[in-house]
A protein has these predicted regions:
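A generic structural signal for short
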Residues: 18, 86-87, 108-109, 140, ...
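Residue-level detector of anion-binding/catalytic polar loops
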Residues: 39, 108, 185
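Asp-based, Mg2+/Mn2+-dependent phosphohydrolase catalytic module
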Residues: 1-8, 44, 103, 117, ...
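Gly/Ser/Thr-rich helix-start
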Residues: 17, 52-54, 95, 111, ...
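Well-ordered alpha-helical segments embedded in enzymatic catalytic cores
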Residues: 94-98, 151-154
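N-terminal helical cap/lid subdomain that shapes the substrate entry/recognition surface
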Residues: 3-97, 103-105, 118, 126-130
Length: 225
C-alpha cells in the first residue's frame, strides 16, 4: 500500500495530463506545412493548442485560414499524426511513479480522452499502459464526448464504481466541465496545455495542482474525499 489514500478510481485525460504529445503533433503539423511550402512552426506556438483537438490543431497550423478548416485537412492531420504517433511523445515527469502509487494503493486508474479511440489504443502499448489502465474511453467511443458527462459516467458504470468514489484529472476546461456535469470531483492539471487567456482558477475544479508530484500528496486526496 502506498498510504496516499487514492479514491477507488482515478480517471485521467491523456494529452496534456498523462502524456506530453506535443512533439508528435508538432512533427505532424510541420509535415503539413512543408507540403504547402510553409516554414516550420515552433513548438511554443503550437503547444497551447494541443489539448483542443484535431480541428483546433489544424487551424493553429494555418492561422491564415481564420479557423475555416476543411474536413479533408482534419483527415490529413489524423493520418499523418498516426504515422508520428509515439515517436517523440513521453509521459510527463512523475507520471510513472503516480500510476504505480495508485496501483500500490489498491485503487484503479483509467483514461477518458477526446482523442479518437483508434489512436489512443495505439499509444497505450508503447507506454506499457494497455494492460494496466482499467478502461479507455476515446472521443468517438460513445455518442457524446467531453464536455458532455457521458464518457465519465460510462467509465464509472463499466467498472462498477460509484461516481462519488471517482476523481477526474484533466488540463482543459472541458475536462472540468464534464466532471462537474457528471457529479464527479475533479483536479486541474496545471502542467498541461493552455492558451494565454485560459483561466483555470475559474473552471470550477475541486483542486488545482501545478505538478504531477502534487498528486502524490495525501492531503490532496483527503480534501477530495
Amino acid at each position: 500500500m502506498s498510504g496516499i489514500g487514492f479514491p477507488k478510481l482515478v480517471l485521467f485525460d491523456l494529452d496534456g495530463t498523462l502524456l506530453d504529445s506535443a512533439p508528435d503533433m508538432l512533427a505532424t503539423v510541420n509535415r503539413m506545412r512543408a507540403a504547402r511550402g510553409a516554414a516550420p512552426m515552433p513548438l511554443e506556438a503550437l503547444r497551447p493548442h494541443v489539448s483542443k483537438g484535431s480541428r483546433a490543431m489544424s487551424a493553429a497550423a494555418f492561422p491564415e485560414l481564420a479557423g475555416e478548416v476543411a474536413p479533408e485537412m482534419i483527415r490529413e492531420f489524423l493520418d499523418l499524426y498516426e504515422e508520428e504517433l509515439g515517436r517523440s511523445s513521453a509521459p510527463f515527469d512523475g507520471v510513472d511513479a503516480l500510476l504505480a502509487a495508485i496501483e500500490a494503493d489498491g485503487a484503479r486508474w483509467g483514461i477518458v480522452t477526446n482523442k479518437p479511440e483508434y489512436l489512443a489504443r495505439q499509444v497505450l502499448p508503447r507506454l506499457g499502459w494497455d494492460t494496466r489502465s482499467a478502461i479507455l474511453i476515446g472521443g468517438d467511443s460513445l455518442p457524446q464526448r467531453k464536455p458532455h458527462p457521458l464518457p465519465l459516467q460510462h467509465a464509472a458504470a463499466e467498472l462498477g464504481v460509484a461516481i462519488a468514489d471517482c476523481v477526474y484529472v484533466g488540463d482543459d476546461q472541458r475536462d472540468i466541465d464534464a466532471a462537474r456535469s457528471a457529479g464527479m470531483r475533479s483536479v486541474v492539471a496545471l502542467w498541461g496545455y493552455r492558451l494565454d487567456d485560459d483561466d483555470p482558477a475559474h473552471w470550477g475544479g475541486d483542486a488545482l495542482v501545478h505538478h504531477v508530484r502534487g498528486l502524490l500528496e495525501p492531503a490532496l486526496w483527503a480534501a477530495l474525499t
